[in-house]
Amino acid sequence: MQTESETSIAQNARPLATQPLGRLMRRYAVPCMTSLVVAALYNMVDQVFIANAPDLGSVGNAATTVVFPLTVAALAIAVMLGDGCCAFVSLMLGAGKQEDAHRAVGGTVTVSVVAGLVLMTAYLLFPDTLLTWFGGRVNAGTFEKAQEYFFWIALGVPLYVFGQAMNPVIRSDGSPTFAMVATLAGAAANLVLDPLLIFVCHFGMAGAAIATVAGQALTAGLSIWYLTRMKQIHLQKDSFRPRAHLLGKCAKLGMTSFLAQISLVAAMAATNTMLRICSAQDAVFSQEEFSAIPMAVFGIVMKVFQIVISCAIGLAAGCIPVAGYNMGAGRHDRVKGLLTRLLAAEAVVGLIALLVVELLPDQVMLLFGAQNESIHYTLFARRCFRVYLSMIVLACINKGTFIFLQSLGKAAASTLLSMAREIVFGVGLVLLLPQFFQLDGVIYSMPAADVLTAILSAVVLVRTYRSLETEK
């Protein structure tokens, strides 16, 4: 027999099984998408102000490109914990298992704090080695600025991991809007502090990093405040004791998110390395004054890509509570309808992005101080945008497919697709193609990887539709 508390929780969750799918997507996916886009803007905001600082410019942006993969590594841990917990909790709420839900959330809180502290320690102990691995030795100026920036970013890692892990947990509690507000508040703080610390206080790279960490601290603080006022999940002191069997299930569901991010780290390491090697062999970029341009431009292109792909991830991740609840409740017809709507939305996002990067690359680069750089900077950036992101529609659909499969509990298929994209195709092609096409090989590696991944995704999607039809 259900207690009064369990009955209240069930009533709060019931709209997931009854409300129109379009309305649920708007309620959950739009705030989630906004949160992730704003999170992606953290580093991009830094690059905009750094690019326009007279003493930083392209060298400063090259430095942030070196540090960026190490930020993504922290994000990988956060999304594994947060997305996995979100998917697990949604399934448990759909099945009416409230105890497992609150224990999973509490355990995730504890582990995210510990993981952030461990990663911060590693970053502070081995900064030079890590920066060298990710291409920091492209020239002396880039390495020096990367060291300055990375020190402060490393100090903020525990805050970043905790805040990003709690965001999907808050969504799973039925509060996607608060999750969005927590991220927006942090981004707003970063946006205000960046120009103040860089241009007024003249703190340079350190100022950009401190502004980022301050924003992360605000997001983490708001997340802590929400945990004391959850709606569907009632945390107790005992909830925060990690339970291996529950955390293992969460980790399994979040493994796709983790591998997607950590394999992106591997891909960025390979890309940065090949950029450094190929630039040294290029007639223009082998010159000292232009040597930082390829690294700086690729960093900007990747930040723009991160914003677009954050939209794609947000659309899919926002559907996790809806898909998970209906899957747990046996409503496979609604799951199938949600998948169709998601794929269509992903295609629209990708198409809009494609039009921007193909038609307006120069205008985008103006945000990043192109007017202060050489013609080589502008020409290389234009080519990178138009070629490197030419298959961004497929990239969005691929990413939506990976995450939606995760919400259905199909962790193996989701993980294999994600690994194929980032490691087999992503890393493989960025190492292979430059052997034949030099710097152009790096540029063509991403669209080629997206096309090959789309073929695999199509096969898995057909099978998923058939299984949902059979189980209806």
List each language-model region with its residue ranges.
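Short alpha-helical transmembrane segments in multi-pass integral membrane proteins
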Residues: 1-32, 89-156, 200-255, 323-391, ...
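N-terminal transmembrane alpha-helices
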Residues: 16-56, 68-84, 88, 113-120, ...
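Transmembrane helical elements of multi-pass membrane transporters/channels
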Residues: 27-46, 152, 186, 215-219, ...
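Short runs within selected transmembrane alpha-helices of multi-pass transporters and secretion channels
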Residues: 35, 82, 153-171, 179-190, ...
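Helix-terminus/linker motif at the lipid-water interface of multi-pass membrane proteins
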Residues: 37, 41-62, 131-140, 196-203, ...
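Hydrophobic positions within alpha-helical transmembrane segments of bacterial inner-membrane proteins
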Residues: 37-41, 116-120, 124, 161, ...
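Alpha-helical transmembrane segments of multipass membrane proteins
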Residues: 44-48, 121, 165-169, 188-196, ...
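Small-residue-rich hydrophobic transmembrane alpha-helices
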Residues: 61-121, 160-179, 295-355, 359-361, ...
